[in-house]
Amino acid sequence: MAEEEKTELPSAKKIQKAREEGNVPKSMEVVGFLGLLAGLMSIFVFFIWWVDGFSEMYRHVLKDFSLDFSKESVQELFNQLAKDTFLLLLPVLIILMVVAFLSNVLQFGWLFAPKVIEPKFSKINPINGVKNLFSLKKILDGSLITLKVFLAFFLGFFIFSLFLGELNHAALLNLQGQLLWFKSKALWLISSLLFLFFVLAFVDLIIKRRQYTNSLKMTKQEVKDEYKQQEGNPEIKAKIRQMMVKNATNKMMQEIPKSNVVVTNPTHYAVALKFDEEHPVPVVVAKGTDYLAIRIKGIAREHDIEIIENKTLARELYRDVKLNATIPEELFEAVAIVFAQVAKLEQERQKQKIIKPL
């Protein structure tokens, strides 16, 4: 039997399970673009500070070399240079780490997945490694990198060719003018490349999300199996509901002998009312239609409960009053008439009991 095609979108449960395993849609092009953007902005922000810092380091080197040129002093000097260079670059390194972290958070939210670091044989299996090397995902990633390099080179060459005509004019400028000319062209080139990398990152993000969705797609059978696991087998749930309805019905039927009257339609509706010292307002203790109405009337006859026909009241009680709830105020008068009928019937029955022995 051929394997069923995966045509269904992944469920929320499958996506959550994939997240717990560290499987999330992630575009390294987005991370790289935001990192590049942050790096360039950091250069503009810290450029003057770097110039001052590296100038001070240069003066310090010349001063130390002029005083002493021993092995120990040179080693100490290089240690100091490494320390000063690290401190100068530290703010940018921190910014790049924060941007890399946030660029991932923006793509797939906060995520803690310990399963990612768990050792798995499949990760070191050379056969799987070869398969992954020639997978569609790797081919697309490689193609995008090649396209990125080609487009960047082509764009740079195109922009540089536009500048060639201005080189003769720029050569006639003074040093300050040449620097300003070079700065404007450099900003133009950088802006163009950033726009290109932004477009490529956006395209890569769409591709990665589509690949992610396709990798998690499910067969129709998998969807059914997952539904059964989450919601339970529909047949079993139906049986449980039937049992619950049956138990509720049996409990309701047990309350009928405690009622004072059953109001009927007469055939389609039956509502049992209870009225005593504990219930100063009549309460609906049982109600039903059709077959259930017949059962209610049958139990009422078995226990000598009065059955009063009132079509309008029976329908209103069934429709508007919940089980074990008191009747609403607007039905007080109609229900009072019913209980008056019940009282009259009981009086007549008592008279018959008295007259009968005579």
Swiss-Prot record:
Name this polypeptide is given: Flagellar biosynthetic protein FlhB
Check the record and name the Gene3D superfamilies matching this protein: 6.10.250.2080, secretion proteins EscU (3.40.1690.10)
Q: Does the keyword S-adenosyl-L-methionine apply?
A: no
GO CC terms, sorted: plasma membrane
Q: What does this protein do?
A: Required for formation of the rod structure in the basal body of the flagellar apparatus. Together with FliI and FliH, may constitute the export apparatus of flagellin.
What protein family does this chain belong to? Answer: Belongs to the type III secretion exporter family.
Q: What is its main location?
A: membrane
- Pfam families from the xrefs? Bac_export_2
Instruction: Tell me what organism the protein belongs to.
Output: Helicobacter pylori (strain J99 / ATCC 700824)
Query: Which keywords appear in this protein's UniProt record, sorted alphabetically?
Result: Bacterial flagellum biogenesis, Bacterial flagellum protein export, Cell inner membrane, Cell membrane, Membrane, Protein transport, Transmembrane, Transmembrane helix, Transport
Q: Where are the transmembrane segments?
A: 31-51, 86-106, 144-164, 187-207, 323-343
- Which compartment or compartments is the protein found in? Cell inner membrane
Could you mention a single GO BP entry for this protein? bacterial-type flagellum assembly
Q: How does it sit in the membrane?
A: Multi-pass membrane protein
* Statement: the UniProt record of this protein carries the keyword Ribosomal protein: no
